[in-house]
A protein has these predicted regions:
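Non-catalytic structural scaffold of enzyme domains
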Residues: 2-171
């Protein structure tokens, strides 16, 4: 897509291939069609294992991927994964590596200002903690009910319809 006459290639980085695809679909719906899918893991369990790595090891993997994306001409990275953006300091990496990186955590810092109470459902405790922390940055008085459930993410990844998920999990 052109922004101000400039064509941009955007990398969609996410925890799994399904998440990457969902992120690309979101961008496509806004006219951003030159996207590169960057799943970090093959499935939610692998992604949770990746997130449990030592900080330095995890960051080294992400830095290598960012270097490869820059070589491919990607100018922006859109991180479409709460838990991944919770365990990697993408704000710092964006500055350090001179690339624009957009994450859900940036949005949560704004969202916290709009509400008094929020319920947060996340794949795992990494994502839940990151979302809560970023909500509280903007609104320390916010009341958050948090739930982490990897099985819910697996159901989404399997392509289950929302109605089926509601029934299966007794929501």
């Amino acid at each position: 897509m052109c922004i101000g006459g400039i064509l941009m290639k955007i990398a969609v980085m996410a925890g799994t291939p399904i998440d990457s695809k969902l992120g690309a679909e979101l961008l496509n719906s806004y006219g951003y069609n030159d996207v590169v899918l960057v799943p970090i893991s093959n499935n939610p369990v692998e992604q949770t294992t990746f997130q449990a790595l030592e900080d330095e090891e995890r960051e080294n993997i992400i830095v290598k991927i960012i270097d490869e994306l820059k070589e491919k001409g990607c100018e922006v990275i859109f991180v479409y994964c709460n838990s991944l953006s919770s365990v990697v300091d993408f704000d710092r990496l964006a500055e350090k590596m001179n690339i624009s990186i957009i994450t859900p955590m940036q949005m949560y810092r704004n969202l916290g200002l709009e509400y008094k109470y929020l319920a947060v459902m996340a794949a795992n405790s990494h994502g839940l903690t990151g979302v809560e922390n970023n909500l509280y940055v903007s609104n320390p008085r916010l009341r958050v009910l948090g739930l982490s459930m990897l099985e819910l993410v697996k159901a989404i990844e399997e392509g289950n319809k929302p109605e089926q998920i509601v029934d299966d999990f007794n929501f």
